[in-house]
Amino acid sequence: MNKIFDYILSLIYPPKCVFCGKVIDKSDICSECEKTLPYTKGDSVYQKFLFVDKCISPLYYKDYVRRAVLRFKFSGCSCYSRRLGAIMSECAENNLDCGSIDMISCIPLSKKRLHDRGYNQAELLAREISKAVDVKFVPTLKKIKNNTAQSTIKDAKLRAKNVVGVYTVTDPETVKGKHILLVDDVVTTGSTVSECARMLKKAGAKAVYCITLARRED
């Protein structure tokens, strides 16, 4: 019965590539996008930000990647987390020593934004990576102050100032002496991940790594 229902559902809502929207058979990504997405390569996978030991991103934030992220965040496409998380998981396994990571966490949303959106896209990605690399997911941070959306601020110094005092560690004992992988969807100036890493290290974390789906192209 379930198979019949799934078949009917697939006729009404055929699977589409999460990036270009092309109707496909079973996968979440079409063969063309799989080959031509703006992947980071070599040293461009890595970025260094204050308080972050290593930050990696498999894709550049442009074209179909940018559109997919916007749909994922603002159009209720939470199902995208499976494919986007798989891309990030592969990047983590290729560029980090996942066996040394004690926990995976994410950048938190404010209560209002979480309520309005219905989910935290960074948490969905973090949980996908957690399953793929077999490292537990732990929500270590909480947003305690509403601030102006970082995406509306262009100046790097103002972005850094905008996130100071916005986050707190929920349980310092949990992070003390730990190696933590912090997850977010996109990194631009690095202000948010830097501030979250600062708070985690202030609470006693030994190392904080970061992975995002995409990064700004320099």
Predicted stretch roles:
Residues M1-D218:
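Glycine-rich phosphate/pyrophosphate-handling loop used in enzymes and phosphotransfer proteins
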